[in-house]
Amino acid sequence: MEVFLEMLLTAVVALLFSFLLAKLVSVATVENDLSSDQPLKPEIGVGVTEDVRFGMKMDARVLESQRNFQVVDENVELVDRFLSEEADRVYEVDEAVTGNAKICGDREAESSAAASSENYVIAEEVILVRGQDEQSDSAEAESISSVSPENVVAEEIKSQGQEEVTELGRSGCVENEESGGDVLVAESEEVRVEKSSNMVEESDAEAENEEKTELTIEEDDDWEGIERSELEKAFAAAVNLLEESGKAEEIGAEAKMELFGLHKIATEGSCREAQPMAVMISARAKWNAWQKLGNMSQEEAMEQYLALVSKEIPGLTKAGHTVGKMSEMETSVGLPPNSGSLEDPTNLVTTGVDESSKNGIP
């Protein structure tokens, strides 16, 4: 199933990539077509206007030419029947020619008048500029003539007096600033001392609180370590007994899977491995048993493991307790009699004699 999904995903990704590539290519071609069509439009317009202008010029030249009039005269001489009509036409053509001549003359007169007006304006501008230059020269000469040595001395005296006044004002401001700065410095030092004392007190209080919390946490950790060690010992003994006794085969399949999941949680924690393939049936069943427990704590998993073992094999846990007690007794007997205990030395001697008599030592 997963292989089929992967193949389907690759096919969909390939189709999407090809579609995007085709879309980009089509957009690029459309932009190129638009950019190639844009510069042709003004060229077409320019060509049309030039053709129109050229046609107008040709018409005007034909009307102003003299060869046409000569040809008309010859035609009039050859044809006698239409003398009146041809004469009328010649008269009209003459009027048109004279009208065009008048129009040309008017245009030349207007252009000459415009040129003369422009020249007049330029001349006026030149005159105005010259007048402004003369006025500026006269003003400079008057200012130079008005500057006398007496006026210069008076201006220097005034400037010196103003400089002295400004220096006195600055010195007064500096003195005021220095006096005010001393006061501000003293006040700021007092504020800093107060803040530093408050900060020291707060830091001391925080350090004391942290020490208290650390002590309480260490005490809790010590107690938790003792409890966990006992639970872990019982769990390890049950697991070893279950493996050595060979009674795991007597347990049902569901209970066996549940024991496997609890053992995984107690030893490795919550399940973080990937799901195995559907072909691996046993591995998938074990993974499901492990995943089903979720985020169960290791202590809870150990307790449930012991409870399930005692339920499925009742005598196994009792044997485990007896074995644990025997190991504890062996460790207690192996200790020396004066290993830091606060018992009476006479009792220690009597206990040693009793133990030697039991073991058959004279």
UniProtKB/Swiss-Prot annotation:
Keywords in alphabetical order: Coiled coil, Lipid-binding, Secreted, Signal, Transport
Residue span of region Disordered: 132-151, 193-214, 329-362
Source species, domain of life: Eukaryota
Effect of residue 284 to A: Loss of arachidonyl-CoA-binding activity
InterPro entries noted in UniProt: Acyl-CoA-binding_protein, Acyl-CoA-binding_sf, FERM/acyl-CoA-bd_prot_sf
Gene Ontology, cellular component aspect: extracellular space
Record note on what altering residue 305 to A does: Normal arachidonyl-CoA-binding activity
Residues where an acyl-CoA binds: 260-264, 286, 305
Domain ACB: 231-318
Tissues showing expression: Expressed in roots, stems, leaves, flowers and siliques.
Impact upon substituting residue 260 to A: Normal arachidonyl-CoA-binding activity
Coiled coil: 192-221
Compartments it resides in: Secreted, Extracellular space
GO MF annotations, alphabetized: fatty-acyl-CoA binding
Range of residues in the leader sequence: 1-22
Pfam families: ACBP (PF00887)
Job description of the protein: Binds medium- and long-chain acyl-CoA esters with very high affinity. Can interact in vitro with arachidonyl-CoA, barely with oleoyl-CoA, but not with palmitoyl-CoA.
Family: Belongs to the ACBP family.
Name of the protein in question: Acyl-CoA-binding domain-containing protein 3
Species for this entry: Arabidopsis thaliana
